[in-house]
Amino acid sequence: MNEYVRMKASAMKKINDLTLSGEIVIFGSTYMSEFPIYELTNKCKLENAVYNRSIKGLIVKEAIEILDDCVVDIHPSKVFIALGEEDESDPNAASEYSRLISTIRQKLPEAMIYMIGLTNGGSFAEKFNKNMLSLCDNKNVKYIDLIKKSSSENALFKAQFKQLSCFFRTSPITMSDIFSLASL
C-alpha cells in the first residue's frame, strides 16, 4: 500500500472517536479529497454531520484495505463512494469496486450506499461508470452522475454539492432549505 495512503488512513482512524455514528461518510480519492465539503455543508447548515474520508491518490484496492478505519468504524447511515479516478491502469478495478460494495453491505447492512460516477470523461470513465451502474439495486445502492462542467471550478463545486446535498438529507426539504441551496 502507498505510504501516504497508510499515513492518512491512520490519522483518520485516530479521530474516529470524535465522530457521531449514524451520520454521513464520503470515501473517495483525489477529487473528493480536494472538494470543499466542510465549507459547503457549514454554509448550508445541514442537519447531519458529514465526514470526508477521501485520500488523494487512493485506488480501489487500497480502499478495501482501509475501509474499516475510514468508514466502518464510524458506523454511518450513508456512505458516498467516489473512487476509480486513480485506477485507469488497473484492469481489475471494476471487480475490486464490486468487492468494496459487497464488503460495505456485509459490514454495514443498514447503510445506504451512493456511488458517485467518475467526472473526468474518456473511455475509461465511461466503462467504469457503466460497471458501477450495474452494481446498483436502487434500494440500498444508488448511483449519482455528477455535473461534469461549469464556468469555473467554484461554480462546479457548488453545482455538484447541490446535487449531493439532496442525498445528505434525512427529512423532507423545506422552503428555507431550498433558498439556502439556491444561494450557493
How does the language model describe each region?
Residues M1-H75:
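Serine-esterase "nucleophile elbow" of acetyl-processing enzymes
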Residues N42-K45, L58, E65-L184:
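Alpha-helical cap/lid subdomain in secreted, periplasmic
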